[in-house]
Amino acid sequence: MAKQKVPAAPSVRRLPSYLHLVKKAEADKLEYISGTVIAEELELEPIQVRKDLTITGIVGKPKKGYPVKLLITAIEKFLGWNKEKKAFVIGAGSLGTALSGYQGFKEHGLDICAAFDSDKRKIGKEIHELPVFGMDELETKVKEYKPEIAILTVPSKYAQEAANAIVKAGIKAIWNFTNIKITVPDKVIVQKEDLSSGYAMLGVMMNTKK
């Protein structure tokens, strides 16, 4: 069976910004919002906005734009934010702790229910009211909590070892915040976040302002 084509990453990454604006329009009691308005707010070209929104399956109405409520539903469904997904944080260090406490995830249906670490000083304690378990408990806790996602925040030198444990435990999606490209079976999905890329863009924009 052929693999389903994944939409272009830039288009997908812009959808949350669109969703934020459309929800604001809903709060302002607007029934429709145009691609032009979205484009102006985000400093994009209207044709780009329309192209991005087509991947959600919604079509705008001439001279009116997009129905606000339907657009919210379409974007959330496309992103998978209309259904709750449970997640484990693997690595209870500074980054893992920060992500565990980010309340915005819950707005998008991501429920972080536990953290894991190999440091005995952290095991048995809590971070942001989440229990911290030892890595040797991962398989047992996967059966108990049934998470779909592992958020990987361990030090880079332990990334592959932790990824192996995640795969063995049966989790099929890894959000990788380490700077290591981990190796996993084809059946496991990996999304790598490169925080340095965002910093690089910030640096370039600052240089152009000088």
Curated annotation (Swiss-Prot):
NAD(+) binds at residues 91-96. GO terms for biological process: negative regulation of DNA-templated transcription; response to redox state. One of its GO terms (molecular function) is DNA binding. InterPro entries: CoA-bd, NAD(P)-bd_dom_sf, Rex_DNA-bd_C_dom, Tscrpt_rep_Rex, WH-like_DNA-bd_sf, WH_DNA-bd_sf. The keyword Phosphoprotein does not apply. Gene3D superfamilies: NAD(P)-binding Rossmann-like Domain, Winged helix-like DNA-binding domain superfamily/Winged helix DNA-binding domain. Transmembrane segments: none annotated. GO terms for cellular component: cytoplasm. Pfam families: CoA_binding (PF02629), Put_DNA-bind_N (PF06971). The keyword Lipid metabolism does not apply. Signal peptide: none annotated. Keywords: Cytoplasm, DNA-binding, NAD, Repressor, Transcription, Transcription regulation. Residues 17-56 bind DNA. It is found in: Cytoplasm. Modulates transcription in response to changes in cellular NADH/NAD(+) redox state. Belongs to the transcriptional regulatory Rex family. Homodimer. This is Redox-sensing transcriptional repressor Rex. It comes from Treponema denticola (strain ATCC 35405 / DSM 14222 / CIP 103919 / JCM 8153 / KCTC 15104). The lineage of its organism: Bacteria, Pseudomonadati, Spirochaetota, Spirochaetia, Spirochaetales. The gene is rex.
